[in-house]
Amino acid sequence: MAAPVGRTLLGLARGWRQLDRFWAGSSRGLSLEAASSSSRSPWRLSGALCLQRPPLITKALTPLQEEMAGLLQQIEVERSLYSDHELRALDEAQRLAKKKADLYDEEQEQGITLAQDLEDMWEQAFLQFRPGARETEADKKNDRTSLHRKLDRNLVLLVREKLGDQDVWMLPQVEWQPGETLRGTAERILATLSENNMEAKFLGNAPCGHYKFKFPKAIQTESDLGVKVFFFKALLLTGDFVQAGKKSRHVWASKEELGDYLQPKYLAQVRRFLLDSDGLSCL
């Protein structure tokens, strides 16, 4: 008799545990759904691309740098060993001196001045070399839509977009789409710029900066306050931003020129992740 009663009590206990799990799961699902709906952010997310063209040539040396470079070159020459060419030239000079003293065998005459001939050829090639101009035609015309300007500086791509009834200069940006990463949003910007004509190397998966702005009160709601923009750096490898008939919609600007285009609050946030051009890293 005791055994059937024990089995009955055990079955009732199992049934209560199943009911508890069911109600707990149901309440948890309802609470998660309520939390997700209540925690939905009123801010839209956007990704922005900080596309930089790194310097193509070195900066011109200052007088102090030129003096230091000359001093280091002098120290290098004084402490260095003879190169193979210099040893060969010294050997040929000794053989030539023996020839003048009638101590030189005519069978060894071949190639006496070969090292000197090489030096003469190199000297002629050096005299014919003309270095490229540091100032390009775009620099002379102040054509900021051209990528071939300020070759010793970093340049950043800015575009002019329509926001409401205003034309605003900014870094290229688009709205984030569900299912993609913020870096994926920045990569999508690059793909749409100039019809996939540019290739760039992204510097990491994390944003280098952010900026947020609120919508005008006329269109602002409790569930739609404004936009949070996350910036991603990328270095231009190949290509150029070329759009026929839209040359006034983009510029390649140096750090000092950003103030001519960007609004003060936006510029202050952008400058936080743009290093000085004389720094060790890009921009």
UniProtKB/Swiss-Prot annotation:
SUPFAM superfamilies: Nudix (SSF55811). It holds the Pfam family MRP-L46. GO terms for molecular function: structural constituent of ribosome. The modification N6-acetyllysine is found at residue 228. One of its GO terms (biological process) is mitochondrial translation. It is found in: Mitochondrion. Keywords: Acetylation, Mitochondrion, Ribonucleoprotein, Ribosomal protein, Transit peptide. GO terms for cellular component: cell junction; cytosol; mitochondrial inner membrane; mitochondrial large ribosomal subunit; mitochondrion; nucleoplasm. Gene3D superfamilies: Nucleoside Triphosphate Pyrophosphohydrolase. InterPro entries: NUDIX_hydrolase-like_dom_sf, Ribosomal_mL46, Ribosomal_mL46_N, Ribosomal_mL46_NUDIX. The modification N6-succinyllysine is found at residues 217, 246. Coiled coil: none annotated. Belongs to the mitochondrion-specific ribosomal protein mL46 family. Component of the mitochondrial ribosome large subunit (39S) which comprises a 16S rRNA and about 50 distinct proteins. This is Large ribosomal subunit protein mL46. It comes from Mus musculus.
